């Protein structure tokens, strides 16, 4: 990992003890960059460029009044890639809805995407390894790494949509069908307002930003 510039050597470990002195290692923040795309707002794609410690070094946004398309996502990725002379280690994309482990967005009500191979589309267009995941799961991972979150935690996100994420023993629980946190369209009031999904009285239709 040192040869690949993921880690760097700080020097020998000077603690007392027998044997050969080991090297103290740290994350190398001067070489690789990571592209991050947030699609939690279907009409505003947000992008960031970060080093390997997670420190954001650049941000940009792409308005999409008619809803974000795959072309919008690819355009934003390419814009961020072009903004730095440093190599890109990977692209991470957070999407509302149900995302399969292979990066296929099975269903996103707000983005109006169904069975979309987003990972493959972005990788083919950029040549950069890409990870696609649910936005609420991604938020919980961020809270775990950079916040004050325990290894056993739950996060509930309320915005344009409603979602939940669960972490047990430092593992995000997605379920066999990748729907463990999909609470938005659980019907809580059969006589409630019509939801974007077409059903009546979904949790999202009662407590999302648009309804509160």
Give, region by region, the residue ranges found by the protein language model:
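Glycine-rich phosphate-binding loop and adjoining helix at the ATP-binding site
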Residues: 56-152
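Active-site core segments that coordinate phosphate-bearing ligands/cofactors
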Residues: 185-212
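Conserved phosphate-binding catalytic cores of ATP/NTP-utilizing and phosphoryl-transfer enzymes
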Residues: 9-12, 16-34, 133-153
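A short, polar/charged loop-to-alpha-helix boundary motif
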Residues: 67-73, 179-191, 195
């Amino acid at each position: 990992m040192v040869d690949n510039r993921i880690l760097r050597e700080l020097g020998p470990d000077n603690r007392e003890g027998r044997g050969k002195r080991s090297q103290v290692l740290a994350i190398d923040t001067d070489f690789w960059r990571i592209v991050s795309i947030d699609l939690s707002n279907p009409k505003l794609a947000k992008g960031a460029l970060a080093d390997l410690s997670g420190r954001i070094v650049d941000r940009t946004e792409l308005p999409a009044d008619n809803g974000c398309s795959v072309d919008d996502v690819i355009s934003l990725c390419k814009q961020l890639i072009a903004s730095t002379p440093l190599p890109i280690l990977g692209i991470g994309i957070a999407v509302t809805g149900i995302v399969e482990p292979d990066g296929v967005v099975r269903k996103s009500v707000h983005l109006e995407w169904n069975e979309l191979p987003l990972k493959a589309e972005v990788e083919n267009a950029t040549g950069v390894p890409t990870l696609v995941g649910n936005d609420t799961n991604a938020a919980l991972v961020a809270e775990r790494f950079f916040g004050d979150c325990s290894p056993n935690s739950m996060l509930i996100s309320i915005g344009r949509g409603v979602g939940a994420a669960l972490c047990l023993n430092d593992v995000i629980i997605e379920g066999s069908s990748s729907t463990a946190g999909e609470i938005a369209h659980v019907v809580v009031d059969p006589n409630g307002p019509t939801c974007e999904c077409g059903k009546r009285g979904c949790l999202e239709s009662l407590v999302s930003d648009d309804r509160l």
